[in-house]
A protein has these predicted regions:
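Glycine-rich phosphate/adenosyl-contacting loop at the front of the ribokinase-like
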Residues: 2-80, 90
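A glycine-rich helix N-cap at a beta->alpha junction
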Residues: 95-112
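Short, electropositive alpha-helical surface patch
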Residues: 85, 89-97
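Short secondary-structure boundary/capping elements
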Residues: 58-65, 88, 110, 138-143
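Short hydrophobic segments within beta-strands
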Residues: 11-12, 80-82, 121-123, 130
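Conserved phosphate-binding/catalytic loop of the ribokinase/pfkB sugar-kinase fold
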Residues: 104-108, 117-144
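Short, hinge-like loop/turn segments at secondary-structure boundaries
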Residues: 27-28, 96-98, 122-124
Length: 144
């Protein structure tokens, strides 16, 4: 019997998590409900990103995070998700591979950028997420 290449293959949204600190006034200025997750469009994510302070950028998304966790526990994991040929796409691909997860999906050229989630952490530790799905849902119908 042939050896299996992977223990688990995950399919999901390839999202770059951008984690930074802010205060309640920052959230109010952008009408971001504290402690919630909201989907936003590209102009909003760009405005928030430009206004926020220093941040940590790392590959994320629930399925990608699960595959990284599996790999960290010694499993053989692969991830299928769409990124664009842009800086955030490069960050996602680098980080997921560095976590030991196989990621071979070709980056989309031109058009919609890579998905990202700005995770704003207030002094009390509350997280507020603003997520732009970007290119990740494009061509999703091919999977179903």
């Amino acid at each position: 019997m042939a050896e299996t290449r992977f223990d688990v293959v995950g399919i999901g949204n390839a999202i770059v998590d951008i984690i930074g600190r802010c205060d309640d006034d920052f959230l109010a200025r952008f009408d971001a409900p504290k402690g919630h997750m909201r989907l936003v469009e590209e102009p909003t994510i760009r405005e928030l990103y430009d206004a926020m302070g220093p941040a940590i950028e790392i590959s994320g998304g629930s399925v990608a995070n699960s595959m990284a966790g599996l790999s960290g526990l010694g499993g053989k994991a692969a991830f299928i998700g769409k990124v664009a040929k842009d800086t955030f796409g490069e960050i996602f691909a680098h980080d997921i591979r560095a976590a030991g997860v196989s990621f071979e999906t070709a980056a989309a050229d031109g058009g919609t950028p890579t998905a990202r989630s700005l995770i704003l952490v207030t002094p009390d530790g509350e997280r507020t997420m603003n997520t732009f799905l970007g290119v990740s849902p494009e061509d999703g119908c091919l999977l179903y």
